[in-house]
Amino acid sequence: RFSKNWHPHQIAIVDDMQVLLAKIKGEFVWHQHEDEDELFHVIKGTLEMHFKDKVEIVSEGEIIVVPKGVAHCPITKDGEEVHVLLFEKLSTAHTGNVKHENTVSNYPKI
C-alpha cells in the first residue's frame, strides 16, 4: 500500500497508544523522545539500533524498546529494506527532538 521508506502509517490506536507500520532502509537520523518509550517489532529483515555506547541487532520476529530520553539511530545494512511495527504514545514526535527531511507530522492511516 505504500513504498516510501521512513514514512510510517498508522494501523491502529489503543487508548493513548498507536501502532505504526513502516518500511525502512539505510540510515535514519539520530534523535530521542524525551517523554516516551518506543517499541520496535521487526517483522521482516534485520535492524541495527545504534545507541551512543552500543549497537543492538534486532532480527525478524524480535523486539527492542528504546527508553525515553535515550538517543538512538535505526539503521539497515547492505541496502536491505526492513519492515517494522512501532508501538508508541500518540504524543510521540516522529523524530523526537530533531527536525529532519524525513520527519513526518501526521501519519497516514491504513
Identify the residue ranges that each predicted region occupies.
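Short loop/turn positions at the edges of beta-strands in beta-sheet-rich folds
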Residues: I13-D15, E34-E36, I43, K68, ...
